[in-house]
Amino acid sequence: MKVLAAMSGGVDSAVAAARAVDMGHDVVGVHLALSRSASGKRGCCTPRDAQDAAQAAQTIGIPFYVWDFSEEFQEKVIDNFISEYSAGRTPNPCLRCNEHIKFSSLLRRALALGFDAVCTGHYARVFLDEDGTYQLHRASSWAKDQSYVLAVLQQAQLKHCYFPLGATPSKKLVRQEADERGLKVSKKPDSHDVCFIPSSNTGAWLSQRIGRRDGDIIDDLGQRVGSHTGAFAYTVGQRKGLRLSSPAWDGKPRYVLDIEPISNTVVVGPRESLRVDELSGAFTTTGWCFTSRPIECSVQVRAHSDPVSAIAFIRDDVLVVRPDEPVFAVAKGQSAAIYRGTRVLGQLMIDNTKKYASS
């Protein structure tokens, strides 16, 4: 099989590429240049990352190239990130990058050049079932599982995905293997921040691009309790950094409950008001057919949160998910991954949330 190995400059993608070679595949390494800026200390898009990827490819013994996807990344990921926050929503840029860059723009170019698959260092697994359907599953190591950010992938993409690390028990073993292979990235730290925000200060980064927008912070009773310089700097569930002018009447901590972009208002209130009993919105499927008939499943609303048992069904052309127990601090714009066991059924883009009246 002819494999294009996407090499970020980190240890996971380097070991994945090496394993692809070990399996006898014809492997070519490629680094995605996603930004023309030289800023940033950690991530996957700096010149240092490109150098690390090139060095790893040389050690493995495979050809290596750098492909420029900066324009697509700007439009599909960065501009989307800014517009979503401006609209009071909370996007996941890693998920958007997988959807539009790694497994769209990159995959299309790879297929056009005669490659059979794109190999990445993601911790997930793909199986071909008896019906010819490609199933996306969690990694063997749930601690490192990344199926949440891959839940947007569909059959045409999964058919060409190759995840050599999916069955690896732990990241420690990956680092150990990298060291044994002589890969200098074996001790390179993991990146947990948004790669295109060097300072890790999302609010300040957004403010530079959107501009200052003074507005009010109100409580759930409609009383003004503070002010802000940009509602885009807040997200649902946030507690720190609110700088409220008056304490809550009940003495309880207050959290961001909602962001109203039209009035440029941030609404705060008690944690119990963050409860969500129903999620709904547009969806994609990895190959599962959702219908109006409810199915038992589990839902995961964040990359590293625990899944919650739920039912899912179609209503008025949108996917509705009702967790068996409430989930908290779910923001519009977030994604929810839908599972049955370890299998990913699809992804819900959360457009609406609902809280049922207490019994």
UniProtKB/Swiss-Prot annotation:
GO terms for cellular component: cytoplasm. Keywords: ATP-binding, Cytoplasm, Disulfide bond, Nucleotide-binding, RNA-binding, Transferase, tRNA processing, tRNA-binding. The gene is mnmA. It is an enzyme of class 2 (transferase). Its EC number is 2.8.1.13. It is found in: Cytoplasm. Belongs to the MnmA/TRMU family. Residues 144-146 are annotated as: Interaction with tRNA. One of its GO terms (molecular function) is tRNA-uridine 2-sulfurtransferase activity. It comes from the Bacteria. The record marks 122, 334 as: Interaction with tRNA. The active site is at residues 97, 195. Disulfide bonds join 97-195. It catalyses: S-sulfanyl-L-cysteinyl-[protein] + uridine(34) in tRNA + AH2 + ATP = 2-thiouridine(34) in tRNA + L-cysteinyl-[protein] + A + AMP + diphosphate + H(+). Catalyzes the 2-thiolation of uridine at the wobble position (U34) of tRNA, leading to the formation of s(2)U34. SUPFAM superfamilies: Adenine nucleotide alpha hydrolases-like. The keyword Hydrolase does not apply. InterPro entries: MnmA-like (IPR004506), MnmA-like_C (IPR046885), MnmA-like_central (IPR046884), MnmA-like_central_sf (IPR023382), Rossmann-like_a/b/a_fold (IPR014729). This is tRNA-specific 2-thiouridylase MnmA. PANTHER family: MITOCHONDRIAL TRNA-SPECIFIC 2-THIOURIDYLASE 1, TRNA 5-METHYLAMINOMETHYL-2-THIOURIDYLATE -METHYLTRANSFERASE. It comes from Tropheryma whipplei (strain TW08/27) (Whipple's bacillus). Its main location: cytoplasm. ATP binds at residues 6-13, 32, 121. GO terms for biological process: tRNA wobble position uridine thiolation.
